[in-house]
Amino acid sequence: MYNTKKMIPQLHSWYEKQKRPLPWRKTTDPYKIWLSEVMLQQTQVKTVIPYYNRWLNELPTLKAVADTTLEKTLKLWEGLGYYARCRNFYKACQIVEKEFSGHIPESKKLFLKLPGVGEYTAAAVLSIAFGKQYPVLDGNVYRVMARLLAFNGNRREGNRVFLNTLEEWIVEKTDPGDFNQALMDYGSLICT
């Protein structure tokens, strides 16, 4: 197993120099971060960027989404695929506007109740937008963890082991959002 006392500062240093200049990294607005996470599901970053920018030009706030029509959101999504993501995001924005006065819940339990929000999306949004100490585990992070822990077992066991380890590590990090994004970038750019 890798020495985490060395690894975490090294990862942070690498990320500060190598992080990708993505538009959703220039904001702490939970709506914009959430939108990016939904769009990035099963879709490459380079494909998402123009859709993300176009969407925000038309619907810059969660309230704007809640107040528009489903048809308009689907038109903006057209070509991105996996349209259930858009329908769920639209429904979820309406719920947030109505039940939470337009404020995305900072409680993981409440956020997970929204349509289309799963463990990964909740952890990503809450750690990046609100600094909550929730680890993310996507394919990129899985590859990093498998190498660091020299793990070659089955995926289900790997998920359990990696999440437990990440939960320990993220407590050591002052910015859990940066920690999660650093692991994702490292997995995407280095551990391919």
Predicted feature residues:
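Catalytic cores of DNA base-excision repair glycosylases
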Residues: 2-192
